[in-house]
Amino acid sequence: MPPKAGPTPIANGDQALTRSDFTTPEEVNEVYRRRARFYDWSVNAYYLIGFRWWAYRRRAIAALGLQPGAIVVEIGCGTGLNFRLLQASIGLSGRLIGVDLSTDMLQQARQRVAANGWSNVELVQARAADYNFPSGVDAVLSTFALSLEPRFDEVIAKAAMALVAGGRFVLLDLRMPDNWLRNLAPMLVWLVRPFAVSLEVAKRQPWKSLQRHFSQYSYQEGYLGLVYIAVGQQNEDEATGRQQTASWRAA
């Protein structure tokens, strides 16, 4: 029996990507290298199909329950689209750490930070699963990014260890719906393929990891079940126990 034909390559200048999956960090990085300069305005195209993505971002950030002076880590911060909303909550006495795989997206974020004169922002180029959270984090946010990381469970586990008592991890992302729209999966994935989403990525379920690592958990869906906001909150016993465990391991 002859071998099955591989996926059709797509010419992209520097390298050929495939139509199957953008799952490796290298492939995701390449997608956002090419999209970085135009990312901010390109995402607005989804308003044409009724996807009010800014409304979901605001709702996710509100769910963090931030106070002035808070330390926030944003995983997959991209060009820093969420920074203004986060800064409005934490103020200049707070600290904002933006983590992203793409150096090109981070360059756009640096320009945003400089233009606004934010002196409390630290930008880190790293794969999400390889990033080591600082201790004493008040909140962790990821919007439309964590599902692109195959090792998302590691990210959530590390975040749970770093969060203070009462600290929250808020996850806003796309998902495969559990309704009739599931039959339209190939078309739905096609709509978000420009942002490195594949069918395999869409089937990932990081909200279940959030539920597993946090005893306090809430979940809500929107946009016909295609988008969700999940919140995990660290209680005092968990925070104390996990921080002690981390100290023992480091000893």
Listing of model-derived features with the role each one plays in the protein:
Residues 26-27, 49, 170-226:
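C-terminal alpha-helical "lid/dimerization" subdomain adjacent to the S-adenosyl-L-methionine
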Residues 14-65, 81, 85, 108, ...:
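Conserved class I S-adenosyl-L-methionine
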Residues 129-140:
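A short acidic, Gly/Pro-enriched loop at the edge of an enzyme's catalytic core
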Residues 213-251:
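Core SAM-dependent methyltransferase catalytic element
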Residues 153-165:
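A short glycine-rich, Lys/Arg-flanked "PGG" loop and its adjoining helix->strand segment in the class I
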Residues 73-130:
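Class I SAM-dependent methyltransferase SAM/SAH-binding core
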Residues 138-152:
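A short SAM/SAH-binding and catalytic strip from SAM-dependent methyltransferases
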Residues 91, 149-150, 163-164:
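Helix-to-beta-strand junctions that scaffold the AdoMet/dcAdoMet cofactor pocket
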